Amino acid sequence: MQVILLEPSRLGKTGEVVSVKDGYARNWLIPQGLAVSATRTNMKTLEAQLRSIEKRQAQEKAVAEDLASRLNGVAVELSVRAGEGKIYGAVTHQDVANSLDQLGFDVDRRKIDMPKTVKEVGEYDIAYRAHPEVTIPMKLVVHAAK
């Protein structure tokens, strides 16, 4: 039996048409909402959904590229309490997101890549993953508060 996968699984990716045994499709995949039978109407619906998903992904990528052009060359500067070059605590993803928010950029803290824990005063390379295909490199400058 041919089915269209609605969720990624070991059988394939979402939207793929795969061939499975009739009992597996009728007793597990379809009742669990993991797949629908591959009829002509379901295929047309799938094609329309895939087109809308592609449009949405193209729009998201355009927004990410716009953000990348605005964030290009931006250095995030944080002033933290420190003693002898060591920070009391650590600089977190949330601290960087708050600093970017103050600069006028609305970013998701979970998409900020910091290569290591920042516990010392200095300059670090960080990145913001705005989209799976768009990564924005930035500098993080941490200095001691006076």
Swiss-Prot record:
GO biological process: translation
Superkingdom: Bacteria
InterPro entries attached to this UniProt entry: Ribosomal_bL9 (IPR000244), Ribosomal_bL9/RNase_H1_N (IPR009027), Ribosomal_bL9_bac/chp (IPR020594), Ribosomal_bL9_C (IPR020069), Ribosomal_bL9_C_sf (IPR036791), Ribosomal_bL9_N (IPR020070), Ribosomal_bL9_N_sf (IPR036935)
Entry-linked Gene3D superfamilies: Ribosomal protein L9, C-terminal domain, Ribosomal protein L9, N-terminal domain
Self-association and partners: Part of the 50S ribosomal subunit. Contacts protein L31.
Keywords in alphabetical order: Ribonucleoprotein, Ribosomal protein, RNA-binding, rRNA-binding
Cellular-component GO terms for this entry: cytosolic large ribosomal subunit
Organism ancestry: Bacteria, Thermotogati, Deinococcota, Deinococci, Deinococcales
Keyword Signal: no
Single Gene Ontology MF annotation: rRNA binding
Physiological role: Binds to the 23S rRNA and protein L31.
PANTHER family: 50S RIBOSOMAL PROTEIN L9 (PTHR21368)
Family note: Belongs to the bacterial ribosomal protein bL9 family.
Organism, as annotated: Deinococcus radiodurans (strain ATCC 13939 / DSM 20539 / JCM 16871 / CCUG 27074 / LMG 4051 / NBRC 15346 / NCIMB 9279 / VKM B-1422 / R1)
Matching Pfam families: Ribosomal_L9_C, Ribosomal_L9_N
SUPFAM superfamilies assigned: L9 N-domain-like, Ribosomal protein L9 C-domain
Protein name: Large ribosomal subunit protein bL9
